[in-house]
Amino acid sequence: MSTHSLDELFDRDGFSRRHIGTLDSTDLVEMLQVIGVESVANLIDKTVPEAIRLRTDLDLPSALTESEVTAELRQIASMNRPRRSLIGMGYTGTITPPVIRRNVLENPAWYTSYTPYQPEISQGRLESLLNFQTVISDLTGLPIANASLLDEATAAAEAMTMARRASKSKSPKFFVHEDTHPQTISVMATRAEPLDIELIIGGTDALRPDDIFGALFSYPTSTGSISDWSAQIAAVKVAGGVAVVVTDPLACVLLASPAQLGADIAVGSAQRFGVPMGFGGPHAAFMATTEAYARSLPGRLVGVSTDTEGRPALRLALQTREQHIRREKATSNICTAQALLANIAGFYATWHGPVGLHRIAERVQRLATMTAQGLKANGYELLHDTWFDTIAVRVPDGAQSVIAHGRSLDLDFRLIDETTIGLTFDETTTLEVLSDVLKAFGVDDSGSPEKFDAPDLGIPLALVRTDAILTAKVFQSCQTEHEMLRYLRRCSDKDLALDRTMIPLGSCTMKHNPRLNEKMARLPGFADVHPMQPQSTVQGALEVIEELADWLMKLTNMPAVAMTPKAGAHGELAGMLAIRAALIARGEGE
């Protein structure tokens, strides 16, 4: 005779039980005795004030089994349609090398390890993050790079506040060149307003070096041009300001470094180094700077030291800059890093090495050049005569029809304005894609887009990179799968993570996602969608966001939820700004 109910037989709580762990009645009694209470209800009585206690059941859906969750998430992912995206704007297609996907992204030795505050159990992670810093330092030409930030827009905002701390100018104004990604400008504006920073957004004619504490230039720009900003940067620095350059790490493989232009700070996103677009994140951003500004650098910084026996060892350096030590006087409230994504980006550069990165960068630039030549040969005008991976095409009488034709060919373009279309090429772009792009513009390539090849166009000769990059041994020795596999294993063997034992530390980072979550997040329907592709093609992602927001509103009894923060520190700042805005709205801004 069965002694189990149907719910017990279906094991509805099996998913959470296996993930969180079991707790039998004996364990529970012992725990309650240790803390001096009689029951869980008694514990709640002692800890949760009566006035705020919820007396009704939460209006949430019933729990699902692991197989049911899998089926539902696969169905939701199928509602998204990964496209051949040429939208760009800081998000590009990329290929995660299988050896890195299998041995880092899918390996709990890498994704369950804790923030490396204890260097004795973190040497592998610290080594990989030092590699990431070295990649960024080499590509930007600046001697110091941090171990990642949350995203490019946040990094730009952090660079602005860093410039204010470091600048000799007393001006509250900061210049941002108008051809910068719009989402970056938007985040900078949000950050600037409560700090009484006045953003001056415009072209070079709006630049007044004597009346600003710093300036930000994009290299390449959002619409694709490659400008030599060295004269503008020099003028800003002579006037006592700080110069920031937003850049693309793949572009820096071919272009003269930001340091060569005179930049004090360089920021950007490492997403295209092997990290899927993921409908906008998460991705690792970066920041690099000069020795003079090292102590103003936000985020974590891995440094080389020695252990008690005098052997080389790695550790987090200059931690007194960080919020967990310096609190309100910290260099930034954003203490979070994107360490796993930074590791992937660093290993991507290690896997390809300088030769492989140069091959990818040159291919991307050549595809953009071939498209530019094909369009110009058929009467189209380009907005710029320089480019790396992005071209802007004038279509005075039919931009919307070209966009629509592209969508019919499974292509997404950027509508810069009503008469201009942006096209961004990436590692995943093929000659077939190029051919279809030309078709969308009504250009017949006669099945041979190679006829438009022109290797020496797009990059000004004066801005061609001539110095070597990634000269360290690690970037020369891991270009075969078995070498990379062994290197990844050697690094992970130096670490302690949840695949070996519990870690007796507690913080906001100590959340171990079920393996299923990681697997579902890598489905193409979730991983390979651009954040700005048509809403009709990302209904699954929007459903997940809306459903999660609904659950959070019910859990918190709040009327609205903002889903944009990428980390706890982001959320804290967003919350404070929301409170501030509410007070201002009701006349209590002071």
Predicted regions and their residues:
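Short loop-beta-helix segment that forms the pyridoxal 5′-phosphate
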Residues: 117-121, 138-157, 552-575
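Charged, compositionally biased N-terminal leader segments and the immediate start
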Residues: 1-22
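N-terminal entrance/gating region of PLP-dependent enzymes' catalytic architecture
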Residues: 26, 30, 45-131, 137, ...
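Active-site C-terminal subdomain of aminotransferase-like
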Residues: 273-378, 383-385
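Conserved PLP-binding catalytic core of the aspartate aminotransferase-like
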Residues: 362, 378-407, 425-428
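Conserved phosphate/anionic-ligand binding catalytic regions in large, soluble enzymes, centered on
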Residues: 275-288, 292-293, 337-341, 496-516, ...
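Conserved PLP-enzyme active-site core in the AAT-like
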Residues: 154-315, 375, 392-396, 404, ...
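Gly-rich Lys/Arg/Thr-decorated short loops/hinges at beta-loop-alpha junctions or inter-strand turns
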Residues: 10, 107-119, 137-142, 168-172, ...
